[in-house]
Amino acid sequence: SDSDVPHTRGAAGIGLVRTETAILYDQSDEVQTTRLRELLKSAEGVPVLLRTCDTRADDDAPWAGETQDRLRGNRLFKPQIRALLCAATDGDLRVVFPMIKDVADWDRCVDEVNTCRDELLAEGCETGPMMLGCVVDMPSAAVMAGDMMEHGAQLMAVDIEDLTRYTLGLVQNPTAAVNQLTNP
């Protein structure tokens, strides 16, 4: 119904869409593309801001360790980028990368997007435009935001909770936080 469409309720866009859970259930780029296309079509033209997989070393989620290792090997990141590029033909997709600590990290993400786009085009797949940016969730990203913009970042999404936590050297695990306070 119209009441389920974001812009009929006054929304100028949808975001920030997290992707960790969807990727962990099915990592194939085909399934991810289908889900993303459904999301973009339901948005009916309003921008959708999506954050790529965020697997922190300090995350207590049971999958974090395995996922972190797999991301380093590009086995999760590449299918996600391919799915995003394919789905971008169906709407206004804006993508931010979390845990970018410096310009070199940013450049690696952009290089991977360009590599995936080239591969898809060589395979005869249509790709759509995506506005790219990063999540400012680390102090170094906040300090280097201007440099990243000079390197092509088109938007920044500030994760104030993580930025504050990392700036102050706090931990995410509540038990560890209590231990840190009681046993400095």
Which sequence ranges carry the predicted segments?
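Conserved alpha/beta-domain cores
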Residues: 1-184
